[in-house]
């Protein structure tokens, strides 16, 4: 598999309190730090991300400390399958668990080994922040940890 990725740095900020990310993903192998999407500076791991951590889906925002951090209990072992991953962030929701929602193939994940939600009204760190690099298929700041697989229809 190629180590290709897409990158964009946005010039005008948009809403950091509400955003969604959606993509079809086919995993090439279950490796640690296989990044689907990232945004940030990568200085001292200062990044927001959606990635596969071995066979777990990990969704997080880390601009120096965790704004939110979820690691699924569901394992993703079928390397022949296409998975539709969707993350919805809305920190204005009154219930903490409604502020970050993760869906796989249209079904909301509800079981996590790590489960930290943002406070009400919290910015998501780097996503939709002016001047921050956003990458599909790798980490920011050097494009490390490329996804071992395919990403399409984002």
Tell me the role of every PLM-derived stretch.
Residues 1-153:
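Extracellular glycan-associated modules
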């Amino acid at each position: 598999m190629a180590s290709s990725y897409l990158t964009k740095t946005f010039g005008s900020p948009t809403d950091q309190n509400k955003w969604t990310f959606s993509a079809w993903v086919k995993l090439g192998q279950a490796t640690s730090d296989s990044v689907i999407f990232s945004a940030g500076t990568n200085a001292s791991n200062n990044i927001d991300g959606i990635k596969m951590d071995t066979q777990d889906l990990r969704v997080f925002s880390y601009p120096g400390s965790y704004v939110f951090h979820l690691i699924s209990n569901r394992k993703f072992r079928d390397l022949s399958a296409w998975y539709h991953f969707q993350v919805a962030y809305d920190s204005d929701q009154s219930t903490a668990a409604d502020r970050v929602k993760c869906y796989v193939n249209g079904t909301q994940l509800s079981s996590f080994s790590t489960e930290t939600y943002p406070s009400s009204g919290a910015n998501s760190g780097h996503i939709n922040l002016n001047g921050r690099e956003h990458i599909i298929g790798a980490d920011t700041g050097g494009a490390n940890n490329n996804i071992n697989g395919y990403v399409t229809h984002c």
